[in-house]
Every structure is written in structure tokens, then in C-alpha cells.
């Protein structure tokens, strides 16, 4: 049987997880995912590199790994937030736990991505759907 493997990746994981934490702590705050924003570097001194950016920041040409000072030249209104490694660790664990609900075969590739063997899950759902659409498989085969 051919295996069905999904590659699952969280888009802009550090920024997304920082945004969710910020909204939980202050529901009236602006969602970082909707404005030009980035995670990385030292927010106070504006040194270091961008480790994640929002889609609106990407539209300004900001790239992961570029110096914060260069990103700020491209987008002076860029909102910078500091890295929060504890939040990322907890979010990564929660992400992996969700994937494990769908398959017992999950291979974590990084903090925000994994390979998930969905072969049995997909086969079981297809059988269930076949039964629902066509009746019992043996009865339908007669």
C-alpha cells in the first residue's frame, strides 16, 4: 500500500504564537498577524535579525534572517516584538499533540513542522464514506 504522508507547517510560527498570546492577555490589542510586524532582535536597541514576520510585513519585502535595522528601513512602522521561547515551546507541544490526534505516526521536523503518516486515517475515513454512500462494502460488491 502506498503511504500518505502530510507535511504540516505553521506559517510564521513565532509571530503567530506571539500574536495569539498577546490577544489572550489583552483581547483589545491589535492582532500582530494583521499589521506589519516581526519577531526578533532586541526591541529596545533595534539590533539583531528578523526570525518571523507577518504577511503584511512580507509585502514590504521584509525577509526572515535580515537585520532588524534593514527591515525598519523598508517599513518604519514595523512593530517589533521580542522572542518568547517559553511560549514557542508550549505552542509547539500543543501543535504536536493535535497532530497526534490524527495519527500515531508523527515525525517532528522542527519546532513548527512535522511529517504525519495519514495512511490509516485516510483509509478509515474513505471506508466510512464508502459505507455511507454505497452501503456495506461486501453487500455493495455482490
Language-model regions: role of each:
Residues 1-139:
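Residues that scaffold, gate, or flank divalent-cation-dependent active/transport sites
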Amino acid at each position: 500500500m502506498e503511504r500518505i504522508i502530510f507535511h504540516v507547517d505553521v506559517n510564521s510560527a513565532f509571530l503567530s504564537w506571539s500574536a495569539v498570546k498577546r490577544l489572550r492577555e489583552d483581547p483589545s490589542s491589535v492582532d500582530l498577524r494583521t499589521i506589519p510586524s516581526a519577531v526578533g532582535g532586541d526591541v529596545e536597541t533595534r539590533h539583531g535579525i528578523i526570525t518571523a514576520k507577518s504577511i503584511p510585513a512580507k509585502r514590504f519585502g521584509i525577509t526572515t534572517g535580515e537585520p532588524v535595522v534593514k527591515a525598519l528601513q523598508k517599513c518604519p512602522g514595523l512593530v517589533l516584538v521580542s522572542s518568547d521561547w517559553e511560549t514557542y515551546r508550549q505552542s509547539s507541544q500543543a501543535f504536536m499533540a493535535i497532530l497526534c490526534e490524527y495519527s500515531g505516526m508523527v515525525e517532528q521536523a522542527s519546532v513548527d513542522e512535522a511529517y504525519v503518516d495519514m495512511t490509516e486515517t485516510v483509509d478509515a475515513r474513505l471506508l466510512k464514506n464508502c459505507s455511507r454512500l454505497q452501503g456495506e462494502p461486501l453487500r455493495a460488491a455482490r
